[in-house]
Amino acid sequence: MDYKKTLNLPDTPFPMRGDLAKREPAWVAQWEENHVYQAIRAASRGRPRFVLHDGPPYANGDIHIGHAVNKVLKDIIVKSRNMAGYDAHYVPGWDCHGMPIEIQIEKKFGKHLPVTEVQAKARAYALEQIDRQRKDFKRLGVLGEWDRPYLTMNFSNEANEIRALGGILQKGYVFRGLKPVNWCFDCGSALAEAEVEYADRVDPAVDVAFPFADKPGLAAAFGLDSVDDGAVVIWTTTPWTIPANQALNMHPELEYALVRATPAPAHGPLLLLARERVEACLKAWGLQGEVIATAPGAALSGLRFHHPLASADAGYARTSPVYLGDYVTLDAGTGVVHSAPAYGIEDFVSCKAHGLSDDDILNPVLGDGKYADSLPLFGGLSIWDANPRIIEALKAAGSLMDVQKLSHSYMHCWRHKTPIIYRATSQWFAGMDVKPADGGPTLRESALAGIDATAFYPSWGRARLHAMIANRPDWTLSRQRQWGVPMAFFVHKETGALHPRTAELLEQVAQRVEQHGIEAWQSLDPRELLGDEADQYEKNRDTLDVWFDSGTTHATVLGGKDQALGGSHGAELAWPADLYLEGSDQHRGWFHSSLLTGCMLYGQPPYKALLTHGFVVDGQGRKMSKSVGNVIAPQKVSDSLGAEILRLWVASTDYSGELSISDEILKRVVEGYRRIRNTLRFLLANVADFDAVSQAVPYGELFEIDRYALTMTAQMQAEVLAHYERYDFHPAVSRLQTFCSEDLGAFYLDILKDRLYTTAAGSLARRSAQTALLDITQALLKLMAPILSFTAEEAWQVLAQSALQHQADVSRTTIFTEVYHALPPFADADALAAKWARLRAIRAEVQRKLEDVRTAGGIGSSLQAEVDLYAGGDDRALLASLGDDLRFVLIVSRATVHEAQGELRVEITPSAHKKCERCWHWRLDVGSDADHPEICGRCVTNLFGAGEPRDKA
């Protein structure tokens, strides 16, 4: 007789190999065909709402690994919240306006297209990019409203953005003024703080002499009768700002010295600088010197000095006063700072505080980085090309004390990677410290209070965002571009004042934009709205900062507080969002701009919590770089290993810091995935012939180890769900993997194989095991589904067509309409957990002893062994309570418990009996049945009798 055929060997259509790269696209297609996202929405309707608002990626170029991390994390959260009993929509979005797309249009079609053509081509280009990115995001297994995403260039979004601008204008936050702003010559526009990055750069550092212009005043300040000729010396790394110098700054409390230098410099023997910098500076200049008098900076306020190029050209025949400033330091230089108010924020504030008007500020640098032609000596030159010319002119004028090359971290445009400057321009600002119209807190005050009311994951994000808001300047809202939402103001041609009906006019423009897009503003004849007043006003040509685009999506998409704007997806979503989730750079980007617009419009943040993830680096911790050759593209991983492996990598990595990825790291992820898949395959194979409706054993009648397994599963599920609740995915993955490999694979399933395979197919012993396995399988699949979406769906379809095929409340379409599994509670759960925890510890000790004997050649498999356990007290009672089932727990052919004092003692003896050909146990009764001499008595009764007596394991 072929006894192998009498075993209940497992069988399942769920394959051992996932073949993920080949099979995943079919699942993506099936989810679309079956309208799975819509099915989730229908199943979730009426539940408490959870809103994760998608930070929009920019609609330009293929997605990179950072995009994949971001979208997978969002997908895990949305799926886990839906399965936890929430109504969690996912509406993906795209950021569509702005410079990068405008640059692409210029590259393709040239720089001199009419604005209407630029806008039309930019809109078409953005749609092409969105289609490419959407395909890649869907390939990652991300479910969402892909057919109806929000786009910042949707007409309704553009219109509501204009309404949002009107809202903050009415509340008193918006003003126009001249201020130094971050300016990129390549963009030809102001930049937001978030668009500035820093890179090392070498610049000339110069020490420049400003000759004395008020010697009597200087003598009096130092308590001297008179002074000889001389100069005050400044240090700067921006020689190009010297032509625009209008003041000098000293610290009121620092001590300044008059030094008689030898040999005498060109402007005279006396030099003025900070006392603490005298020795270092004289050494650098190759001079000897003697301090003849000192005075505090406060005594020097208002003194005047000639421009260092006054002798070179009459255009520089002016003097610069000393203004006092606490920001002057002694870290480098001379303790005296030269001030060109058009090109530095502190310089600007200082000069304005001392009465300099906007019209008085010298601003010779044009938007393209060249000096105005009217500038003496350097007109028409690029400021970078002018640096050496200015240094030569200073030298010729006798005003150059020293020049060195300095490598330092300097501001660059994040798009062009070129250096930028501060440049005073007339811009529209949102004031951080202006009192709003209602007299309430300033924007800075309300934003800082909002940060305190927001939850942060990880917690350090709070301090980071707080510091940024506390120290940031006013927000430059305006940009000088074509592809952007217009600041649709009518400005008086003579006074520069806004039209008195601006609020009403903005709404009228918004209504037109709602129908025809921002192009409606471009084509609008002012007479249509202003009538006879049109000749007095001009259309403002500025566009809104793209960070205002994305920063107002909480209003334009979610609808704003109390659905004030009735956003594009306000019916599905809600305000404020429960969560914003982006990379750590968004503390100065989307988190930041959204906070400011939320506080301006509604007095509070548009989110309840912020989650930040780190950047992706290679296995050595290096930034991804094409030049280094360490870039890992998500498309390539999906096409080779499968998107499931990327999802598992994301979930199993601590995203609060940098996320490391490499081929070697992905190999380890693949190994972890295989172990999980093998566990699932075993579970599915062993419930394939089980029917949940007609064959389930009541929970109170389950074998003891089966009840323990369900208790163990419930504990694991509670831990994983707690991790999900806190967005801690890597410990959740670790717990799931440990459960599969140790709790199931190395313990419960290992013990269960004998009962599943050898007892009668319909016996209580086997059905008890299958009842527990089915609950475990359902719980496990649902817990894995948010992360291993493809695999969980594949396994669920197998389960739904086998063990669950007759269960009415089970989804046949998708696992994602399910909620987390309700595991049965047991009154003795704590006692079960404690008992079996000790039994597992004893089992581990027995396994170590068995391995020693196996290594020594005494036995082959553990079933060849017989075990004698010597124990007293609780251990003896524990072991004895299992009766003959103890041998199945230990996976040996005999296990006998003996009363003994002291610690547990284990003795292993190779069995002297024959091996049963069916169950492989070595038993005394093998051959006792004449009709079946090859098998043991237990197998005989399982095959031909009432079945073995057994109720523990």
UniProtKB/Swiss-Prot annotation:
Compartment(s): Cytoplasm
Record flagged with keyword Nucleotide-binding: yes
Record key words, sorted: Aminoacyl-tRNA synthetase, ATP-binding, Cytoplasm, Ligase, Metal-binding, Nucleotide-binding, Protein biosynthesis, Zinc
Subunit structure: Monomer.
Task of the protein: Catalyzes the attachment of isoleucine to tRNA(Ile). As IleRS can inadvertently accommodate and process structurally similar amino acids such as valine, to avoid such errors it has two additional distinct tRNA(Ile)-dependent editing activities. One activity is designated as 'pretransfer' editing and involves the hydrolysis of activated Val-AMP. The other activity is designated 'posttransfer' editing and involves deacylation of mischarged Val-tRNA(Ile).
HAMAP family to which the protein is assigned, alphabetical: Ile_tRNA_synth_type1
This protein's name: Isoleucine--tRNA ligase
Taxonomic lineage: Bacteria, Pseudomonadati, Pseudomonadota, Betaproteobacteria, Burkholderiales
Gene: ileS
